[in-house]
Design a protein with these regions (language model features):
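Flexible loop and strand-edge segments within Gram-negative outer membrane beta-barrel domains
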Residues: 251-257, 270-327, 333-354, 387-395, ...
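Outer-membrane beta-barrel signature, preferentially recognizing the C-terminal barrel domain
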Residues: 292, 299-314, 318-320, 441-459, ...
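Transmembrane beta-barrel wall of Gram-negative outer-membrane proteins
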Residues: 184-213, 225-283, 305-319, 365-369, ...
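Short acidic/polar hinge/loop motifs at secondary-structure boundaries
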Residues: 115-144
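Short, acidic, small-residue-rich periplasmic hinge/interaction motif at the N-terminus
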Residues: 23-68, 76, 104
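C-terminal beta-signal and adjacent terminal beta-strands/loops
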Residues: 474, 530-532, 582-596, 603, ...
Length: 729
């Protein structure tokens, strides 16, 4: 509670300073000189295009330029510096987004608004099968988003948007992009190329490919933490191999990823229809845990080999039917498989395939009311095969209908929506090799999650906005939460499901204060979520076959916290261009800033101090204990300089110690990172180019991620310097 009070006081001080600055600024400085940073379009927010400031929910969008510097081998690491978002950090090849302390089955990862279809929600060692290297943007909804995207979005949504299916006619017959990057921390070598070709009117084709390779992760000291090293024998302590005491590099943490996609569209003045095919391939290692394996025997190297193939089809049509302005249709079919390989043997094979389809219709405005209605059909088959299988084959079917409406009343906008879905889970008991996995209470399950939300946006002054959003959400349990029973060696866990689980029920509220113009811009948000029947992956303290036993357990839980980002612009937001007749008038000295006889123009240079932070407090209300793997208090300060050609920044990032821990969990020390970057834009002929250099953890500090199941054997990366380029034409 003391941390929360301290954080709230700091965030309140930032908001108070913002208000004070607003009171003393001249009128001309109130123009939204930085509006381009906050008015980016939200793609996942439904069929109606809206900006970040048009949503009652807390939304963050990373645009293409930002992603070029932030892109990492995993989606979780790419987003981990955003307020309210962290990465699960299991390995360099597997890190899933964690939003406000919630992860896995409560965070829905999408690609262009449809299901990614992998098994990254099933276990932390499974990587999201989507790459950020060629994405156009990544959009994050912090908090429940079940209205549009189902019960799996009860904690939030991450959508990776790309241009594989073109949606408009390009201005030239051929355009493209080439990217490259090198990072010294793990010897990352990555590259990407994308081409868009329009041979004739209406027809547009797109092709792209990317590849990423890293070696084992470099770390400042020992891979194992002090607690594990204290239990090693003297001979083991001197060793530097697997199962002993690696120093400087963590063995078996390499990543090999490549993906490609081709797409085509027919585009006309009232819409488009298109399709695409893509494949994602990845191989990555999992570091050894000497507390699980026999330290006298060199362990086999565990690695995961991922192969996903996907077919997409999308269309958008203007004025398709009476009463509707737009119809958006999406369809995706996916075939996914990965092998978990222990040495030369396949211990388990995970397979999933399925369909996600949705139709959204935007209604014509009725007075001040506008909105959309839609439906969704989702089907997924999941199987886990092999000696380490812990789940019988299952089929999950979801059918849903939803509505979202907005009522505009001058400075106030009211938003509300609802969703109802039916979910059926069928478990297949016919495989004689998997009879040991059958639970006595096992049977097919049916659920009927219902969700509703209401929000208000109040533009109470120029550049100021207050947003309040309330939600009631339900989430149906997944097949693995209900029926899992067996070992999972990659995570060193023995997993037991609970067939008696019911729907999670969540009541939440989110309040945001936003400032989009003036000397200080940014936002501050606070949230509260109360769960009944919260499905927790709970350690029992028991050991089965050398593995820690975890059980899916329902409980009452609450999450609350805050996040903020504030930019203090240190240069004038506007410059003045004098009128010709005043050019020689000595009385026109006011034109240095702004004045009645001058013409204000946006200052192309921006020097700003950015302060940001976030805090999450999560409690098991049945016992009063903290929930496990909750993001610690984080805050940072950076000085940034941007011009039309240059951008540079230096940042100090602090992650506090996490000592508010669940039973059978250990505390994690805090750490401080010093980061810096510089980039330059230039044009050569018909090409536009961007080059950059970025340094992370420049002081080479040892750090461990509290959210990672492997934090005791896998530190965060040491000092790294990355260099990259992007060329478009």
């Amino acid at each position: 509670m003391k941390k929360f009070i301290t954080t709230a006081a700091v965030l309140f001080a930032v908001a108070s300073f913002t208000a004070a600055q607003d009171a003393v600024q001249p009128a001309a400085s109130l123009k939204p000189a930085r509006a381009a940073e906050t008015e980016r379009v939200v793609v996942i927010g439904g069929a109606i295009e809206q900006s970040e400031t048009d949503k009652a929910q807390s939304v963050t969008i990373l645009n293409e330029n930002t992603l070029k510097q932030k892109a990492a081998p995993t989606l979780g690491d790419t987003l981990s510096s955003e307020p309210g978002v962290a990465g699960s950090g299991f390995t360099p090849g597997a890190s899933r987004p964690v939003i406000r302390g919630q992860a896995d089955n409560r965070i829905r990862v999408l690609n262009n608004g449809t299901e990614v279809f992998d098994v990254s929600n099933l276990s932390p060692d499974h990587a999201p099968s989507v790459s950020a290297l060629l994405s156009q943007s990544i959009e994050v909804v912090r908090g429940p988003a079940t209205i549009l995207f189902g019960s799996g979005a009860i904690g939030g949504v991450v959508n990776v948007a790309d241009n594989v299916i073109p949606v408009e006619q390009p201005p030239t017959a051929l355009s493209g992009e080439v990217d490259g990057r090198f990072d010294s921390a793990d010897l990352e070598r990555s590259g990407a190329i994308a081409l868009t070709f329009s041979p004739a009117k209406h027809w547009v084709f797109h092709a792209e490919a990317s590849v990423l390779r890293t070696d084992d992760r470099d770390v400042p000291g020992f891979a194992l933490n002090e607690r594990i090293r204290a239990g090693l024998t003297p001979a083991q302590s001197q060793g530097r191999g697997f199962g002993q005491n690696p120093e400087g590099t963590v063995p078996n943490t390499y990543v090999r990823t490549k993906d490609y996609a081709i797409g085509a569209s027919y585009v006309w003045d009232k819409g488009y229809v298109g399709a695409s095919f893509s494949e994602f391939l990845s191989v990555y290692g999992v570091p050894d845990n000497p507390e699980v394996d026999d330290p006298t025997v060199p362990p086999n190297r565990v690695r995961l080999d991922v192969d996903k193939r996907q077919v997409n089809a999308r269309s958008s049509v203007v004025d398709p039917f009476p009463w509707f302005t737009t119809a958006n249709a999406k369809f995706v079919y996916t075939d996914y498989k990965h092998d978990e390989i222990d040495g030369d043997e396949i211990g388990a094979t995970f397979k999933t395939n399925g369909v996600d389809s949705r139709l959204e219709l935007v209604q014509k405005p009725i007075g001040f009311l506008e909105g959309s209605i839609g439906g969704q059909f989702f089907y997924k088959e999941l199987s886990v095969l092999g000696d380490e299988a812990f789940l019988q084959p299952s089929q999950t079917t979801e059918i849903a209908a939803f509505v979202f409406e907005e009522l505009k009343l001058n400075k106030v906008r009211l938003q509300f929506g609802a969703r109802i879905e039916h979910q059926a889970i069928h478990i297949d008991n016919s495989d004689p090799d998997l009879t040991s996995l059958i639970s006595p209470d096992q049977q097919d399950q049916n659920f009927l999650p219902i969700s509703g939300a209401a929000g208000v946006l109040y533009d109470f002054a120029e550049g100021w906005q207050l947003a309040v959003n309330g939600t009631y959400s339900q989430r149906a349990p997944t097949a693995e939460e209900l029926f899992a029973r067996g070992p999972h060696d990659a995570t060193f866990q023995f997993i037991i499901g609970n067939p008696n689980l019911s729907e999670e029920k969540n009541v939440g509220v989110d309040v945001s204060l936003r400032r989009s113009a003036g000397v200080v811009t940014g936002s501050i948000s606070g949230f509260y979520n109360r769960y009944d029947s919260f499905i927790d992956f709970t350690p029992t303290g028991l050991v089965e076959d050398g593995l820690q036993v975890f059980v899916y357990t329902p409980k009452a839980a609450e999450f609350y916290g805050a996040e903020a980002r504030a930019d203090f612009h240190l240069l004038p937001l506007t410059l003045t261009k004098m009128r010709d007749q005043e050019a020689n008038d000595p009385k026109s000295v006011k034109n240095v800033v702004t004045g009645d006889r001058s013409e204000p123009q946006k200052n192309p240079n921006d020097l700003f101090l950015r302060l940001q932070g976030d805090y999450v407090h999560a409690t098991d209300l049945d016992t009063g204990d903290p929930l496990p793997r909750i993001t610690p208090l984080r805050y940072s300060a950076s000085l940034n300089y941007e011009t039309e050609k240059w951008n540079a920044s230096i940042e100090c990032q602090r992650v506090a110690e996490q000592d508010r821990i669940a039973p059978f969990e250990t505390s994690t020390p805090g750490y401080t990172f010093l980061n810096a970057s510089i980039g330059y834009k230039f044009r050569v002929g018909a090409t536009y180019n961007y080059v950059y250099v970025k340094g992370t953890n420049l002081t080479n500090e040892e750090a461990r991620d509290h959210l990672s199941f492997l934090k005791e054997v896998l530190p965060l990366a040491g000092r790294g310097v990355a260099a990259g380029f992007r060329t478009t034409f």
